[in-house]
C-alpha cells in the first residue's frame, strides 16, 4: 500500500510527513558526522567504485555491477565486489564466496555476480572488512561496492547512481512519504546518474538491458521456449521483468511477484508452477537451482552503456591510480 503512495501525491502522503522530517534530520546528521570525522570511515588502499541509488526498490544495480566487472577485467584490472549480502546468513564475516556458496549464505545478488563473472566477491555487514579481505587475500586492485551509496563507513572514489528510467524518483519525497533514501540534491554529487530504461535526460547516462537466450535453471543449457508460460520474479520491481517478457513475445499465463531477496519454498513452487514452463530472473535462479524442475528457465540480461562513458570511467580510474602511486 505505502509503496503505491510513493509514486503519487495525495493527502495520504502527508500523514507520514513528521516521520519523513525526522528521517531527513537523522540522515543529514549521519552523513555530516562521517564527513566531519565524528564517525570513523575506512579508506581502502585501492580505488573504490560505489554503485547505488537514492530510492527504495530495484533499479538495475546488479547488471551495472556486472558491466563494470567485465569492463575493468578487459582493461587489465583485477576487480573485486563487496556487498552487504542481503537475504543471506554466512557462517562468519567477512565471507569470501566460493563455487559451493549458496544464496542462503551470501545472498542472491553476490552469488549471481560470482557465478556470472568469476571475480572475487566478499560479503559483510561492515563492508570495510570485506574490502580488506579482498585486497589482502585476493590481490584485487579495484573494488566495486554493490548497493553501498549510503554506507558512508566506506570511503569511495567514484559513485554511480542507477535510476529506474520510468519510475525515476517517484513523488520526490523522502521516506516514508516517498521512496527517497536521500534528497534529489545527492545526484549532483556523483560521477554519473545511469538511467535504466526509459529516456535519459541530457545529464544522465542511458543504460539498456539486452536479454539473452533463455537458460535452463538446472543445466544452464540454452533453448527456445514457445507456447504458454508462467513467470515469477523476486526482485525489487517485478513488473519490469514481466513487461520485458511480454515485449519479447512470450505468452505469459501467470505472473507471480515475490518479495526481493525472498527465500523460496520448493514445495510451494512445485505446486504452483507444475503445468507450464516457468521463466524467472537470473537472480531467482541462483536460489532455485537445487530443486528446479526440468522446464524451469531463467532470462539473463546484459547491461549496455555508451562507449564514451566507458572511456571516461577508465580515464578517471587511471588518474586515481596515478595520483595514489599505484
Swiss-Prot record:
Where on this chain does ATP bind? 55-62
**Catalyses which reaction?**
a lipid A disaccharide + ATP = a lipid IVA + ADP + H(+)
Does this entry carry the keyword Lipid biosynthesis? Answer: yes
Provide a GO CC annotation, any one. plasma membrane
Involved pathway(s)? Glycolipid biosynthesis; lipid IV(A) biosynthesis; lipid IV(A) from (3R)-3-hydroxytetradecanoyl-[acyl-carrier-protein] and UDP-N-acetyl-alpha-D-glucosamine: step 6/6
GO biological-process terms attached to the record? lipid A biosynthetic process; lipopolysaccharide core region biosynthetic process
Q: What class of enzyme is it?
A: transferase
One of the entry's Gene Ontology molecular-function terms is: tetraacyldisaccharide 4'-kinase activity
One short Pfam name that applies is LpxK
Recorded hits in InterPro entries, A to Z, give: LpxK, P-loop_NTPase
Query: Is Lipid biosynthesis among the key words of this record?
Result: yes
Q: Which UniProt keywords apply?
A: ATP-binding, Kinase, Lipid A biosynthesis, Lipid biosynthesis, Lipid metabolism, Nucleotide-binding, Transferase
Q: Which SUPFAM superfamilies match?
A: P-loop containing nucleoside triphosphate hydrolases (SSF52540)
Q: What is its EC number?
A: 2.7.1.130
Function in brief = Transfers the gamma-phosphate of ATP to the 4'-position of a tetraacyldisaccharide 1-phosphate intermediate (termed DS-1-P) to form tetraacyldisaccharide 1,4'-bis-phosphate (lipid IVA).
For this chain, the family text in UniProt reads: Belongs to the LpxK family.
Q: Which PANTHER family match?
A: TETRAACYLDISACCHARIDE 4'-KINASE, TETRAACYLDISACCHARIDE 4'-KINASE, MITOCHONDRIAL-RELATED
List the protein's name. Tetraacyldisaccharide 4'-kinase
Originating organism: Tolumonas auensis (strain DSM 9187 / NBRC 110442 / TA 4)
Q: Per UniProt, what is the name of the gene that codes for the protein in this document? A: lpxK
